[in-house]
Amino acid sequence: MASLTYDLTLAGLSVGSAAALTGIGLIVTHRATGVLNFAHGAVAMVCAFLLRQFTVEWGWPLALGTAVTLLVVAPAIGVALERLVFRPLAVLGGDPAQTLVASIGVFVLLVGGAALVWGTGARADAPTVVSADPWGQLAVALALAAGVGAVLRSPRGRPLGSRRRTRFATELRAVVDDRPLAVLGGIDADRVAAAGWAFGSFTAGLSGVLLAPYVRLDPYGMPLLVMEVMAVAVAARMRSLPVAVVVALGVAVGQSQLTRLHPAGRAEPLLQAVGANLFVLALLVSALVLPGVGTRDALPRTATARVPTPPGAWIVAVVLFLLPLGFAGSDLHTSVQVPALGVVLLSLVVVTGRGGQISLGQAAYAGLGALFTALLAAGRFPGLPRLPELAALAVAVLLVAPLGVLTGWPAIRRHGLALALATFAVGVGVSRFVFAQPYATSGLSLGRPAGFGGDRAYYVLELGLLTAALLAANALRRGRTGRALAALRDHEPGASAAGVRVPALKLAAFVAGAALAALGGGMLGMGLRAFDATAYDPVRGLLWFAAVVVLGADSVLGALAAAALLVGLDAGARGGVAAVLVGVLAVLVGRFPGGPYEALRTAASHLRLRREVSLTPLGSRVRRRLLPRATPPAARPSPRSGTPSPAAVPAPRSGRGRTAPTAPGSGRSDTTPPGPHIRPGTAPPPSPRTRQGAAPRPSPRTRQGAAASSPPGGRPGAAAASGHRTGTGAVSAPPAGAEPRAPLSMSLRALGLRVAYGGFTALDGVDLDVRPGRVTAVVGPNGAGKSTLFHCLAGTLRPSGGRVLLGGRDITRLPAHARTRLGIARTFQQLAVFPSLTVDENVLVGAEQGRTADPEAAERALRLLGLDGPVRAFPAAGLPTGTLRRVELARALAGSPRVLLLDEPAAGLDTPEVTTLARVLRALAADGTALLVVEHDLDLVADLAHTVHVMVAGRIVASGPADRVLERGYGG
């Protein structure tokens, strides 16, 4: 018994050493570049194949082949990846989630390339670099960990590191944290990143050549095996090398020891599955239970950008999908797979494209759909009778859909890298613990529904199911649900602030995605007449994800094109061509966010000849003489709308001293929206651009007097909302029923709020009362706790002590979206608009998700903020800052809030825009809304606020009327 334990321990140490090397490589790459390298396993596989090629095929000496592979080829792969793929993303400011998509593309590219060069079969003659004695491999792993630890040791601890090493560690950390700032500081960021990638690829190659003699060496199996070992790096929080080594050795030894247990009964297959896949179980635990890695990273906008559909594309798609009805033989049999795979990829359009959630486990749901359909049709599903094939497919979809919670639950608190790991872990777990188990899948065959046994008849059935799936996906992407999903994708905090139930919506997206994937998987299984576990392995899931992303994740047409591309290339070309093509496109997705069509259109626009027309000197003199007599450009009406021509409208300023472009076709200057001071039948005040000179900002005392002179009973907000601009800029009478509804008066109170971060106290017993009909301002220096207080009131931060009351109700534990539905709206210091939605749709999200479901609320908000013109039809992306500030405020007002919280509302606005903003906010207060403003612009505070609170070091040190508090020198 002791001898068996010793032998199993040695076997575990051998596997654990290779796993430790993988963890070390992943951690080093992540610490050096900030990238979680999903291609690590693919690099290991390529190096193992190259060493075999050098020594077995070409007859090189083992020492020479090993040296070339590990010291030349592996680092060269890392440097090439850094130079060609990840450096451009870093220079362009790509976020970690964007580099994640690129690393998945590299994985798919290398796997496909290896399949092209060496074929898809497994090799059993890989050379042994280190003897089977585990002590040699363990020594390699420990020596490598010690060397890396010495290089990466922080400057505070120098016993093992020289000055050069500590300086390199500092430079490495600086490049990862802020590459542009590191470059400005004189650090050679390219050299540091290249060194990190070279070393990471070296460790990947070392892991590959050590594992190759003992595992299955093939283009698909070995990369997946190495990626399963990613659990050790995740458990070490991508930071601690000792933890990674200990976890790797412990899991490997435990996995080896489990092989000695052989219980009787039903527990035996389960225990065997756990014993063979303990690293997979560790990956599931570390990805689903431990705190997420990179939780702040969302899926990049380039991966989910709205892709323009080429003219006539749908007609072409319909024709192409009908063509197989004229095929016969093997061509028709192959075509049967296209509609089924199209349905599977539609699930990614819903989850990733529209919902913005990274999902690498959709292949698992497709496989479960096929497996459950086969079990139900065969009468082998526990507790259910044998069902006809179509009924079995429907029941399988209903059974798999709730399992979408397996990936939807982690998505509630995880984003980007953490969510990618969680969904990938679920996919690997299902593949290993369900699909690979003979007790669940042995002897399964899957027939086709009665009357659809032939390929042509079954293809017709598939087209009907595909049409139903397209309608379902389109319904999820349109209307109220579609707008909420787009808001969640574009800006999750903004969506929550608008009232979107983010957790429930994420779960709904993953459940719908699981249902679609199960439907497609069942169709695919019936088309092939069998359940093939390899058709749903995690590597194929990565390929599907990459294909959908590169062809337009938010495009239904892109999913259909991806299905046709993958099936066509797999059937008509050598294995691996589809993976290579998709991998190349995925690597380039950061540069061409709209997919191949957008890239081709951009290239065509650059190649198109542009003829520039210039006037001669005589023509210039004639123009100068005639120009004063011509009609001013701003007065020319647009031929369609009668509003001033968009090209002639002066560009408004988006910030202090900066001019931003006006949205084309907006029909008005961004600096002169109708303000609440305008009464029906009166002309608006002259634009600052029409005056001889811009008037200076009035003093705080003058502003207070001007504000006080406005009669509170005049309801300026009602006047502003009840009138609308005509084409000439005048304000006409409102349509019937356009009167705004005053919100029910309700105050927001903070009682003894306390927030501490470690040993730092951000809020220390803060009391605050935001009363209806009044503007309350909070000022103070940076770090005083203003933003922390704001987040506690908005619901994005839970205080460690104290309470938040709304009209006497304790809302301290309520999340942001729940507070929005109670009547608390907010804006953000950094703009929180939804770029893929139009101005109208942005505001409509607030009206649909806010406190009251009032269909006219969006229209009133648009009219109040001067957004009811042509600009309402334009996407928010690219609009000037001033316009976007109004869009954000209009969205908040569309929910009919009782309390409005504004965080730096004047950020990025010029003087006329700030003046207009103050008019609107005063009107809202006059209508009974309670306003809280956190602002550094003391002139705006003096002009606007009734009460000012000054915060210093987490406490309110002064309170009172604005003129008295500000004239005493507080606030700055």
Placement of each model-derived feature along the sequence:
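Transmembrane alpha-helices and adjacent helix-loop boundaries
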Residues: 15-18, 22, 41-44, 91-126, ...
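The feature captures the beta-strand-to-loop junction immediately N-terminal to the Walker
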Residues: 779-781
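Helix-to-loop junction immediately C-terminal to a conserved catalytic motif
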Residues: 794
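Conserved ABC transporter NBD signature motif
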Residues: 802-809, 822
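Catalytic Walker B motif of ABC-type/P-loop ATPase nucleotide-binding domains
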Residues: 900-904
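A short, surface-exposed alpha-helical micro-motif characterized by mixed small hydrophobic
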Residues: 941-943
